Amino acid sequence: MADNKVNLSINGQSKVPPGFRFHPTEEELLHYYLRKKVNSQKIDLDVIREVDLNKLEPWDIQEECRIGSTPQNDWYFFSHKDKKYPTGTRTNRATVAGFWKATGRDKIICSCVRRIGLRKTLVFYKGRAPHGQKSDWIMHEYRLDDTPMSNGYADVVTEDPMSYNEEGWVVCRVFRKKNYQKIDDCPKITLSSLPDDTEEEKGPTFHNTQNVTGLDHVLLYMDRTGSNICMPESQTTTQHQDDVLFMQLPSLETPKSESPVDQSFLTPSKLDFSPVQEKITERPVCSNWASLDRLVAWQLNNGHHNPCHRKSFDEEEENGDTMMQRWDLHWNNDDNVDLWSSFTESSSSLDPLLHLSV
């Protein structure tokens, strides 16, 4: 091959056998192909061609260095070692579209615990230095180790060191980085496209009372009042606002109730909130949660007017403390507003727990 070009086809047919793959190891590239090339020895199957790295782009190399007709993931070629710029000592690896930039440290290649060469990794950047754009093209440049051996081996390169450094050969392997994706190509996720999970996780609020029952309001109100035990005085204003909202809620209804409960007592204009604001920090809270659980469970399970259940509940109340002591929801001053008493007076015909109020 005097023209230094690899022609693997004769009359349109490949010279290599079908299924031929060229996948040499690093040791084979250095110890066989590159060493024979440096020593001008004949290579049995000369499939690696010579390439001027400054005249070919990475995407052109895969066409020039193709071996056979089978698909390839990497391409091999010989190139001049450390070709310098005309007016300097820096290695010239620039092409028309970009440049090859070395990255990292050189890796030592060994054979049988013996150093035979080095591998340099380079990345192709599009544009001009130092503002090039990194691409997915990678090149491994293999060169023989021209350091004098001190272990007595005889196969040291016999050429002039200066001539070898300036006019030597390297064997290169070019490939594309796997799973390479640009950040600009990734789909952008906006906040508007995300599902609104926060709204679904929120519990019922006082501003949306259409799908919330009166019992839910009572439970939520009791839970908030129970937390006043550890609440500082600076948060009493917020608690007072919750109390006002609670007064505007619809009253409880029994399952058999067909007529709405009179809500005239819930009108904000007829309520005087000044005692509530004055006594907000002195109001006792519900501390017996066991009694509250029993009361709620009884109302849910025994909401119908069942004389047997009512009688058993009355007997249980007579044997224990009064519900006034268990709940501690009434205020000591009779002149102040009693929310629970007003609630029971208005729903006396519907509330099965009327006898529990004092």
From Swiss-Prot:
Annotated disulfide bonds: none
GO BP annotations listed: fruit dehiscence; plant-type secondary cell wall biogenesis; positive regulation of DNA-templated transcription
Keywords, comma-separated and alphabetical: Activator, DNA-binding, Nucleus, Transcription, Transcription regulation
Cellular component annotations (GO), alphabetically ordered: nucleus
Zinc-finger in keyword set: no
Cellular localization per UniProt: Nucleus
Tissue: Stems and roots, specifically in interfascicular fibers (sclerenchyma), cells differentiating into vascular vessels (cambium), and xylem.
GO molecular-function terms, A-Z: DNA-binding transcription factor activity; sequence-specific DNA binding; transcription cis-regulatory region binding
Record-linked InterPro entries: NAC-dom, NAC_dom_sf
A Pfam short name: NAM
UniProt main location, coarse: nucleus
The entry's DNA-binding region: 116-183
Domain NAC: 16-177
Keyword Transcription regulation: yes
Record comment regarding domains: The NAC domain includes a DNA-binding domain and a dimerization domain.
Role noted for this protein: Transcriptional activator of genes involved in biosynthesis of secondary walls. Together with NST1, required for the secondary cell wall thickening and lignification of sclerenchymatous fibers and secondary xylem vessels (tracheary elements). Seems to repress the secondary cell wall thickening of xylary fibers. May also regulate the secondary cell wall lignification of other tissues. Binds to and activates the promoter of MYB46.
Protein name: NAC domain-containing protein 12
Organism: Arabidopsis thaliana
Lineage: Eukaryota, Viridiplantae, Streptophyta, Embryophyta, Tracheophyta
